[in-house]
């Protein structure tokens, strides 16, 4: 049984004012309530109350992972270079990796994620189809050298994460393991009290095919997702697609060259011709692994460079600079058009469908062209959905206008397939006596990030407001200050603890009742029990932290009520 936590002995220092550098609600409140302390940019200490919340979340995750048959392990955070070099992620992760050398000059990294090491572990431990399927997980610190760590524990350079991996001999087995994890994640986030959405996502540097994110809607979120109000479609904006729908372009006239001096931008061109930007074709030049590539999108839309990068990964995508036009007579800056670009690969968004007509650059200084028809006057080498998704864009599933919302990514699940198994030749002996290539899934939950997400969703103007399952205590008993009140508070705390409840009691001497009441709301335990003015009568005040409802109860009534409410 847990002991009663006495605040007179607990290392907790609350603050009245927000940290000067805090922007998000979770950053402000977790620091003010004494849950975390900043050591450096993106590096945080979890203090006693914060560590309890972190552990409670980890325990929920652990219980649900165990329930689907996953086995807990702990792999090293300090990892050798070679596996990540073999997978390509030593280079692909770039500056995001913390790299170091040992005293002998060997290259190492601090693990950002563990697909490579888990693959090698299973290759060593599992040699027959009889050893599979297997699901392994760990709860461990990850390290990523974020360029701009911010928002407190939402985006740190080290963070707590649950990562798990499934290993199967068939695609059907992978689909089953994926479904088990998906269902477990739903249970985990429901138990944590996190409002969440499951959305389609892209796999990014993780690789693989099917991918879904678990997002917690919050104003402080760094992710934007598209939600359909009419059907069940939801996707990260980088995963939203637009169907290619060719149109009949036979009625369009011949290409007409236009004199358009001093119109190198879509805005100046549209104003000069008196046409909407949507009638123009924007041709963005980028470098893909050093090769100049043109990307065509409607003039009133922006290219989503993240989306473009996902489509072209693992290639490196960069915007061109003025120097890239030197010696390129075929590229006229500000007047590029798709027609006649023989030396440049031309990619286009599906909105630039065959048969659509555009006003676009004529590849001559001060000149544009009208009636330039896709499929007639220029060919698209590849169609890629690359525009920034906007509010009201049609739902890919039903056509209703999409709604955009901000959210915090709290989980991500992937069907990796055989990407890493191929890299490390992960085979087992099959039923027919022949090697069978293993197929994998990868599944992550941001444990420390979930603390911040819950804060963003549940806190109010008074402070934190934890769901019971992850709160640092079930009941916060407050002794108003006098000796009799303190004696009653300690007595009822022991009785509540004996009844199986986790109790935090504020017995700090020399602290005013007002400060204690304010701290009880800031700390955010679900139930607050006050030994105050009626202590001599054996009467306490019970307050619900979330609703603010209050009632006076005797000691026995309070114990009965709390044990029933928190059972």
Curated annotation (Swiss-Prot):
<dbReference type="InterPro" id="IPR004154">
    <property type="entry name" value="Anticodon-bd"/>
</dbReference>
<dbReference type="InterPro" id="IPR036754">
    <property type="entry name" value="YbaK/aa-tRNA-synt-asso_dom_sf"/>
</dbReference>
<keyword id="KW-0436">Ligase</keyword>
<dbReference type="InterPro" id="IPR007214">
    <property type="entry name" value="YbaK/aa-tRNA-synth-assoc-dom"/>
</dbReference>
<dbReference type="InterPro" id="IPR033730">
    <property type="entry name" value="ProRS_core_prok"/>
</dbReference>
<dbReference type="Pfam" id="PF03129">
    <property type="entry name" value="HGTP_anticodon"/>
</dbReference>
<dbReference type="GO" id="GO:0005524">
    <property type="term" value="F:ATP binding"/>
</dbReference>
<keyword id="KW-0648">Protein biosynthesis</keyword>
<dbReference type="InterPro" id="IPR006195">
    <property type="entry name" value="aa-tRNA-synth_II"/>
</dbReference>
<comment type="subunit">
    <text>Homodimer.</text>
</comment>
<dbReference type="Pfam" id="PF00587">
    <property type="entry name" value="tRNA-synt_2b"/>
</dbReference>
<dbReference type="InterPro" id="IPR044140">
    <property type="entry name" value="ProRS_anticodon_short"/>
</dbReference>
<keyword id="KW-0030">Aminoacyl-tRNA synthetase</keyword>
<comment type="similarity">
    <text>Belongs to the class-II aminoacyl-tRNA synthetase family. ProS type 1 subfamily.</text>
</comment>
<dbReference type="InterPro" id="IPR004500">
    <property type="entry name" value="Pro-tRNA-synth_IIa_bac-type"/>
</dbReference>
<dbReference type="InterPro" id="IPR045864">
    <property type="entry name" value="aa-tRNA-synth_II/BPL/LPL"/>
</dbReference>
<dbReference type="GO" id="GO:0004827">
    <property type="term" value="F:proline-tRNA ligase activity"/>
</dbReference>
<dbReference type="InterPro" id="IPR023717">
    <property type="entry name" value="Pro-tRNA-Synthase_IIa_type1"/>
</dbReference>
<keyword id="KW-0547">Nucleotide-binding</keyword>
<keyword id="KW-0067">ATP-binding</keyword>
<dbReference type="GO" id="GO:0005829">
    <property type="term" value="C:cytosol"/>
</dbReference>
<dbReference type="InterPro" id="IPR002314">
    <property type="entry name" value="aa-tRNA-synt_IIb"/>
</dbReference>
<comment type="function">
    <text>Catalyzes the attachment of proline to tRNA(Pro) in a two-step reaction: proline is first activated by ATP to form Pro-AMP and then transferred to the acceptor end of tRNA(Pro). As ProRS can inadvertently accommodate and process non-cognate amino acids such as alanine and cysteine, to avoid such errors it has two additional distinct editing activities against alanine. One activity is designated as 'pretransfer' editing and involves the tRNA(Pro)-independent hydrolysis of activated Ala-AMP.</text>
</comment>
<protein>
    <recommendedName>
        <fullName>Proline--tRNA ligase</fullName>
        <ecNumber>6.1.1.15</ecNumber>
    </recommendedName>
</protein>
<dbReference type="GO" id="GO:0006433">
    <property type="term" value="P:prolyl-tRNA aminoacylation"/>
</dbReference>
<dbReference type="InterPro" id="IPR036621">
    <property type="entry name" value="Anticodon-bd_dom_sf"/>
</dbReference>
<dbReference type="GO" id="GO:0002161">
    <property type="term" value="F:aminoacyl-tRNA deacylase activity"/>
</dbReference>
<dbReference type="Pfam" id="PF04073">
    <property type="entry name" value="tRNA_edit"/>
</dbReference>
<dbReference type="InterPro" id="IPR050062">
    <property type="entry name" value="Pro-tRNA_synthetase"/>
</dbReference>
<keyword id="KW-0963">Cytoplasm</keyword>
<dbReference type="InterPro" id="IPR002316">
    <property type="entry name" value="Pro-tRNA-ligase_IIa"/>
</dbReference>
């Amino acid at each position: 049984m847990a002991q009663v936590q006495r605040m007179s002995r607990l290392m907790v220092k609350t603050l009245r004012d927000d940290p000067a550098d805090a922007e998000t609600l979770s950053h402000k409140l977790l620091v003010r309530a004494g849950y975390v302390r900043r050591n450096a940019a993106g590096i945080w200490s979890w203090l006693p109350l914060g560590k309890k919340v972190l552990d409670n979340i980890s325990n929920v995750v652990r219980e649900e992972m165990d329930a689907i048959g996953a086995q807990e392990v702990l792999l090293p955070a300090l990892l050798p270079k070679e596996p990540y070099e073999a997978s390509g992620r030593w280079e692909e992760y770039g500056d995001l990796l913390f790299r170091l050398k040992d005293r002998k000059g060997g290259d190492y990294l601090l693990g950002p994620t563990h697909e490579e090491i888990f693959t090698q572990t299973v290759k060593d431990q599992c040699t027959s189809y009889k050893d599979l399927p297997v699901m392994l997980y760990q709860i461990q610190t990850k390290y990523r050298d974020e360029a701009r760590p911010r928002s407190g524990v939402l985006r740190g350079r080290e963070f707590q994460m649950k990562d798990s991996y499934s290993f199967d001999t068939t695609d059907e087995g992978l689909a089953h393991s994926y479904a088990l994890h998906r269902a477990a994640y739903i249970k985990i986030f429901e138990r944590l009290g996190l409002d969440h959405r499951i959305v389609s996502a892209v796999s990014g540097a993780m690789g693989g095919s099917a991918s879904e994110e678990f997002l917690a809607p919050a104003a402080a979120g760094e992710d934007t997702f598209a939600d359909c109000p009419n059907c069940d479609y939801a996707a990260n904006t980088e995963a939203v697609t637009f169907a290619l729908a060719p149109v009949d372009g036979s009625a369009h006239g011949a290409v007409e060259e236009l004199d358009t001096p001093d119109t190198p931008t879509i805005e100046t061109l549209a104003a000069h011709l008196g046409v909407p930007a949507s009638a123009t074709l924007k041709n963005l030049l980028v470098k893909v692994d050093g090769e100049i590539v043109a990307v065509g999108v409607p003039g009133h839309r922006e290219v989503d460079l993240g989306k473009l990068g996902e489509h072209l990964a693992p290639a490196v995508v960069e915007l061109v600079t003025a120097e890239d036009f030197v010696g390129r007579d075929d590229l006229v800056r500000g007047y590029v058009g798709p027609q006649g670009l023989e030396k440049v690969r031309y990619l286009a968004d599906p909105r630039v469908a065959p048969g659509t007509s555009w006003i676009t650059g004529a590849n001559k200084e001060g000149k544009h062209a009208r009636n330039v028809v896709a499929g007639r006057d220029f060919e698209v080498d590849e169609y890629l959905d690359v525009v920034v998704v906007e509010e009201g864009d049609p739902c890919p599933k039903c056509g209703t206008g999409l709604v955009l919302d901000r959210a915090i990514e709290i989980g991500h699940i992937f069907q990796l397939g055989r990407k890493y198994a191929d890299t490390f030749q992960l085979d087992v002996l099959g039923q027919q006596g022949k090697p069978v290539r293993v197929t994998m899934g990868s599944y992550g939950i941001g444990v420390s990030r979930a603390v911040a997400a819950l804060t963003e969703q549940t806190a109010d103007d008074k402070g934190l407001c934890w769901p019971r399952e992850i709160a640092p205590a079930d009941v916060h008993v407050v002794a108003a200050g006098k000796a009799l009140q303190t004696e009653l508070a300690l007595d009822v705390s022991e009785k509540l603890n004996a009844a199986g409840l986790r109790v935090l009691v504020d017995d700090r001497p020399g602290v005013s009742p007002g400060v204690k009441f304010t701290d009880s709301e800031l700390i955010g335990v679900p139930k607050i029990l006050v030994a105050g003015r009626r202590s001599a009568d054996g009467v306490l005040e019970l307050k619900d932290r979330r609703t603010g409802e209050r009632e006076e109860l005797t000691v026995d009534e309070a114990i009965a009520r709390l044990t029933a409410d928190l059972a």
